[in-house]
């Protein structure tokens, strides 16, 4: 009896650290509850805003151990949309992001740091225009919980600035960088 009780206790003790693993989520693009947006200077006089309409990804999030969290995203660069067809055609061309040649951009996190009060630093490798560089996204945990359809969700926002020259994207005038704004909501798998 004592051996059996000891074995059961040992099994529970071993399993406990693994029972609190990160929860896995798929980014909800089907329900349009996520967006990848950009803002770039237009000749130094104003800003052009747009988005990527097609992307997919997933993330793991462990509220108790943020360092175990991760995110992976694939963006269809041909889906760039600034609400102006001719401009979009030009931005997608070889003059800028060359979406015909580089139809995907990817982000794979390598490190997530808890900065306190729901703030996160998400560092990872961004591949854009055929070039892979490390970037850091300043993110914020918005919330998590049950949805009305019986599922579980978690949401984040994030911002980062990309220097176009870092990704060998031609710079035109004052447009040397693009600001990215991310709204990510995931549905638990």
UniProtKB/Swiss-Prot annotation:
Organism: Vibrio campbellii (strain ATCC BAA-1116)
Protein family: Belongs to the UPF0312 family. Type 1 subfamily.
Protein name: UPF0312 protein VIBHAR_05924
GO-annotated cellular components: periplasmic space
Signal peptide range in chain numbering: 1-22
Keywords from the UniProt entry: Periplasm, Signal
InterPro entries: Lipid/polyisoprenoid-bd_YceI, TTHA0802/YceI-like_sf, UPF0312/YceI
Pfam families: YceI
Compartmental location: Periplasm
Record keyword Signal present: yes
């Amino acid at each position: 009896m004592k051996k059996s009780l000891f074995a059961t206790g040992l099994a529970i003790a071993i399993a406990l650290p693994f029972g609190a693993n990160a929860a896995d989520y798929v980014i909800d693009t089907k329900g349009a509850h996520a967006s990848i947006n950009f803002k770039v200077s237009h000749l130094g006089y104003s800003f052009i805003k747009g988005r990527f309409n097609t992307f997919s990804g997933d993330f793991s999030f462990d509220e108790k151990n943020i360092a175990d969290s991760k995110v992976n995203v694939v963006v269809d660069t041909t889906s760039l949309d600034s609400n102006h067809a001719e401009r979009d055609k030009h931005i997608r061309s070889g003059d800028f992001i060359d979406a015909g040649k580089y139809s995907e951009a990817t982000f794979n996190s390598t490190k997530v740091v808890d900065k306190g009060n729901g703030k996160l630093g998400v560092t990872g490798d961004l591949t854009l225009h055929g070039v892979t560089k490390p970037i850091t996204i300043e993110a914020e945990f918005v919330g998590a919980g049950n949805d009305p359809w019986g599922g579980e969700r978690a949401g984040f926002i994030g911002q980062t600035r990309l220097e176009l020259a870092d990704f060998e994207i031609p710079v035109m005038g004052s447009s040397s960088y693009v600001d990215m704004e991310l709204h990510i909501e995931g549905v638990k798998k």
